[in-house]
């Protein structure tokens, strides 16, 4: 679609979303648009420091977990000694960016609002690691904590997965992987999905929305996909195009959150409609006036805080 035909998104977003967009960090260098992925990762980490400040304090522990690919870093957030469940969090970043620091505040708030242990998994990024390595390492970490739950003093009898953007895809893909391969890591009580992509290659929102403000132009989305997948055939894998998986049975209860001006919104709508049509437990909530990635901005946006509280409430209601 010609750029001129797209919606004037920055004129339509909410006042609090505009405040975020217009917030300048004077000590931040320019985005390295033509830089290496390493430079973009470094910038992303620096840019997120401001948005992660002021998060709740709680007991936090870091562990390296063995997988067949090597060790993966994990971080445990423990809001109380007797947690009713454990939530595994998978960060967004287009499969190529992000780490446990860039999503620290999100994980802390989720732990605080749910009063559950949250475990962030620093899964391997692309293009160094190609599909399905990230999913396999996530599953390995989940299995490790299930086997060692007593040693780590965590409750793995009931678990959940949560993630934003690319992390939302990894969240649902990991839950389906466990189901399909009959791997027991505890009962999956719920899955929390904020503005994910689930397999659509084109849609109305992908045509009308997306630009330099969110890093989700058609070219951006293609770049993320090419970095993540090993080959063209992977596009149809049921763990990448999740609509090619069986969504008619034994899908854990899903909280599906959409951002109004997100080009990936139709992925969330289709996922909800598919699950609902087959009587799979799910809830969809649209957050008006928001852009993709708004969950990061709870320092300024009540809507971001609300979205985290909604996800936490959904999860605890399943326990």
From Swiss-Prot:
Active site per database record: 165, 262, 292
Short motif (Involved in the stabilization of the negatively charged intermediate by the formation of the oxyanion hole): ranges: 91-93
GO terms for cellular component: cytoplasm
Subcellular location: Cytoplasm
Broadest EC class assigned to this enzyme: hydrolase
Gene Ontology terms, MF aspect: carboxylic ester hydrolase activity
Enzyme Commission code(s) on record: 3.1.1.-
The keyword Acetylation is annotated on this UniProt entry: no
UniProt keyword terms in alphabetical order: Cytoplasm, Hydrolase, Serine esterase
NCBIfam families xref list: PRK10162.1
Function according to Swiss-Prot or TrEMBL: Displays esterase activity towards short chain fatty esters (acyl chain length of up to 8 carbons). Able to hydrolyze triacetylglycerol (triacetin) and tributyrylglycerol (tributyrin), but not trioleylglycerol (triolein) or cholesterol oleate. Negatively regulates MalT activity by antagonizing maltotriose binding. Inhibits MelA galactosidase activity.
Family assignment from sequence similarity: Belongs to the 'GDXG' lipolytic enzyme family.
Subunit structure: Homodimer. Interacts with MalT and MelA.
Name used for this protein in its record: Acetyl esterase
Organismal lineage: Bacteria, Pseudomonadati, Pseudomonadota, Gammaproteobacteria, Enterobacterales
């Amino acid at each position: 679609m010609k750029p001129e035909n797209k919606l004037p998104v920055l004129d339509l977003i909410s006042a609090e979303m505009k405040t975020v967009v217009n917030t300048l960090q004077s000590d931040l260098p320019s985005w390295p648009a033509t830089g290496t992925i390493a430079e973009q990762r470094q910038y992303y980490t620096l840019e997120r420091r401001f948005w992660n400040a002021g998060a709740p304090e709680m007991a936090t522990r870091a562990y390296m977990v063995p997988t067949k690919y090597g060790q993966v870093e994990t971080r445990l957030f423990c809001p109380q000694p007797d947690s009713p469940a454990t939530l595994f969090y998978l960060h967004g970043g287009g499969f190529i960016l992000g780490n446990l620091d860039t999503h620290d505040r999100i994980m802390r708030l989720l732990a605080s609002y749910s009063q559950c242990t949250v475990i962030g998994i620093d899964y391997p990024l692309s293009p160094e690691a190609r599909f399905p390595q990230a999913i396999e390492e996530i599953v390995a970490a989940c299995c490790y904590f299930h086997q060692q739950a007593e040693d780590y003093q965590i409750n793995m009898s009931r678990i959940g997965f949560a993630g934003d953007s690319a992390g939302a895809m990894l969240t649902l893909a990991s839950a389906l992987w466990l189901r399909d391969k009959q791997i027991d890591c505890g009962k999956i009580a719920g899955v929390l999905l904020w503005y994910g992509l689930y397999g659509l290659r084109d849609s109305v929102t992908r045509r009308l929305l997306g630009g330099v403000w969110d890093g989700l132009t058609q070219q951006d989305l293609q770049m993320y996909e090419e970095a993540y997948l090993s080959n063209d055939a992977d596009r149809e894998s049921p763990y990448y195009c999740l609509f090619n998986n069986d969504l008619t049975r034994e899908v854990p209860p899903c909280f599906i959150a959409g951002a109004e001006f997100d080009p990936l919104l139709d992925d969330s709508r289709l996922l909800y409609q598919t699950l609902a049509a087959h009587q799979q437990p799910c809830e969809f909530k649209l957050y008006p006036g928001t852009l993709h990635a708004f969950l990061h901005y709870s320092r300024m946006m009540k809507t971001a805080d609300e979205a985290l509280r909604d996800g936490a409430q959904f999860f605890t209601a399943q326990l």
